[in-house]
Regions:
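Alpha-helix capping/termination and helix-coil
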Residues: 95, 123-130, 151, 162, ...
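P-loop NTPase catalytic core of nucleic-acid-dependent motor ATPases
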Residues: 1-143, 148
Length: 260
């Protein structure tokens, strides 16, 4: 069986703890055992987010040539979209919940520009909740119920009406918000980083007023991904033409202290 550094599926195996004081890692065969292991890892994610990421990707190790190439590919991607490398520092402070009242990170652009690639790489190591248009329209009262006990929130093409706007503002500002639970009581959603991927500049339906849109905008950092991603052209001078999850975190780590 292949060696893994994180547990996503039943049967994944750990050879040793990455951080013995925080982890206990086992062969995982039954769902009950899997649940027990995940609880330990999720607790680690939320109590020591920085050390969790450092351990997971080996960010405090000396960089290899492969690591440096992965960083350069992400730098090429951001340069291609005229996004400064200070985005690395923005993403680091955001995921560590150190971004103050701007707790939302939004990537806006047309299909095929690489928004999904960035978002998938960012949420890859986290226990995340996904909120999309269908959920928001069908169950507005329960829009945030899947966010309970998670480490990050991903919103894909979010579209919501006035009835949940105030709770959305709280979530994007880094405040605790409330959600209804099916067959349960109203529950508090803890402060979590919110990642947004959308083809639309504004979020929300016609019931939202100008002041609502302005308040939502003030609670997010927005980046426009404006150029189509064609890896075979953009990365033709590199050994590989794929943007990797680890590469993005290596890029973030390299630029985590950069500020505008």
């Amino acid at each position: 069986m292949a060696i893994k550094h994180h547990c996503y599926n039943e049967g994944d195996v750990f050879t040793k703890p990455l951080h013995p004081e925080k982890y206990k890692l086992y062969y995982v065969w039954r769902s009950s055992q899997k649940h027990e292991v995940w609880l330990q890892i999720f607790k680690y994610q939320n109590t020591d987010r920085e050390q969790y990421i450092i351990d997971l990707f080996g960010l405090d190790n000396e960089r290899t040539e492969e690591d440096l190439e992965e960083i350069r590919k992400w730098e090429t991607f951001f340069k291609h979209n005229k996004i400064p490398f200070t985005i690395g520092g923005v993403m680091w402070r955001w995921m560590m919940i150190q971004a103050g009242r701007k707790n939302g990170l939004k990537f806006y652009g047309q299909p095929g520009t690489g928004k999904t690639t960035i978002c998938n790489a960012l949420v890859y190591p986290w226990h995340n909740a996904v909120i999309n248009t269908v959920q928001a329209v069908k169950n507005p009262s329960f829009m945030f119920q899947d966010c309970i006990g998670k480490s990050m929130i991903l919103m894909e093409e979010p579209w919501f009406e006035k009835e949940v706007c105030e709770e959305m503002k709280k979530l994007l500002a880094g405040d605790h918000c409330h959600t209804d639970i099916k067959q349960g009581h109203q529950t508090t959603v803890a402060k979590l980083p919110v990642l947004i991927s959308t083809n639309f500049f504004q979020m929300g339906g016609p019931s939202l007023e100008y002041a609502d849109h302005a308040a939502l905008k003030d609670r997010m950092v927005t980046y426009t991904i404006g150029k189509r991603l064609i890896p075979s052209v953009l990365f033709k001078d590199f050994k590989t033409q794929t943007l990797t999850n680890k590469g993005l975190y290596q890029f973030i780590w390299a630029h985590k202290d950069d500020k505008n």
